[in-house]
Amino acid sequence: LLGQVSRSTMALIVLGLMGLDEPPAHAQTVDIDVASELALAHIVTGNTEVDDIAYAGLRGLSDTLFFRTSIEPQAPVSINLENDELALFPIIYWPITLEQPRPSVEAYAKLNTYLRSGGLIIFDTRDANVAGFGSASPNGRKLQELAKFMDIPALEPAPSDHVLTRAFYLLQDFPGRYVGRYVWVEAAPIDAQQVDGMPFRNLNDGVTPVVIGGNDWAGAWATATSGAPLLPVGRGFGGERQRELANRFGVNLLMYVLTGNYKSDQVHVPDLLERLGQ
């Protein structure tokens, strides 16, 4: 218990530093058929505009996955924390808004079970364009409030050797509509064994249970039913390049959560084989 409290406290300290053509997405009862097909999900915040963009973002990312990988997601799902099952979804996107209510005790229990069982929640404060490092933005403070009763582990800025940087595409950063200074992931244990500077990450098969940032990823992924982007990203060619990198980050996220530390294992194969021969 003390260890959990300590990890949660460390996570909250980090959080404190952070700075459409379709009917609105509404809370819904998740159909049991989702269990047999992969679908991306987002938390319904109660803000219609934010929820619509979250849905459109996951629709765009689902299309990107379909055309570029062997993953064939079905339509995204809008989930109500109080009523819907979370375990059906490998990734849940949670946009932060100031007005969304704090979950109930029962909903927090579901969230913590999800995090401990291999699920990944992407917390997006969507404010990297205005929030600077060292000053808590309003959405950052709201995230801190929402995360208070969640079993979030100790966090660190995603290191340059993190599997997220090479799960499918090779990436140096993780932009959305905005480019923030840091994206936070679970910290490697202090005593983690190092091979060529890279720690073995064994929790949940090496998958961080949370990714936290403010880059408005759904805004960059969002498409209309025609496939056209819904929101501008940057200007001209540079903006389109940023949108492409945001899409690549989305693909890496899905490949990462579905394959665990497979890419990390590949990096460590020579050392592992050497040890097996000893």
Q: What is each PLM-predicted segment?
A:
Residues 1-2, 6, 10:
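N-terminal export leaders
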Residues 17-24:
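C-terminal segment of classical bacterial N-terminal signal peptides
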Residues 26-91, 98, 217-218, 225-278:
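Aromatic-Pro/Gly-enriched surface loop or interdomain linker
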Residues 31-35, 84-88, 107, 114-116, ...:
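Extracellular/periplasmic catalytic domains that process cell-envelope and extracellular macromolecules
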Residues 36-39, 129-228, 242-247, 251, ...:
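An acidic, glycine-rich "communication" segment
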Residues 41-42, 90-95, 120-124, 154-157, ...:
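Structural recognition of the beta-strand scaffold that forms the well-ordered cores
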Residues 53-60, 64, 106, 110, ...:
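Extracytoplasmic/secreted proteins, especially bacterial periplasmic and envelope-associated proteins
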Residues 91-140:
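Short alpha-beta junction capping motif
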